[in-house]
């Protein structure tokens, strides 16, 4: 799971 891109979406 890539929290990097997920964080960008949620941010």
Swiss-Prot record:
Q: Per the record, what phenotype accompanies loss of this gene's function?
A: Reduced nodule number after inoculation with Sinorhizobium meliloti SM2011; remaining nodules are abnormally spherical and contain a few small rod-shaped bacteroids, their development is impaired. Bacteroids development is arrested at stage II-III.
Native species of this protein?
A: Medicago truncatula (Barrel medic)
- One GO term of the biological process aspect: organ induction
Instruction: State which gene encodes it.
Output: ENOD40-2
This protein's name: Early nodulin-40-2
Sorted keywords for this record are: Nodulation
Could you confirm whether the keyword Plastid appears in this record?
no
Q: Does the keyword Lyase apply?
A: no
Function in brief? Modulates the action of auxin, and may function as plant growth regulator that alters phytohormone responses. During symbiosis with Sinorhizobium meliloti SM2011, involved in nodule initiation and essential for bacteroid development during nodulation.
Residues annotated as transmembrane: none
Q: What is the lineage of its organism?
A: Eukaryota, Viridiplantae, Streptophyta, Embryophyta, Tracheophyta
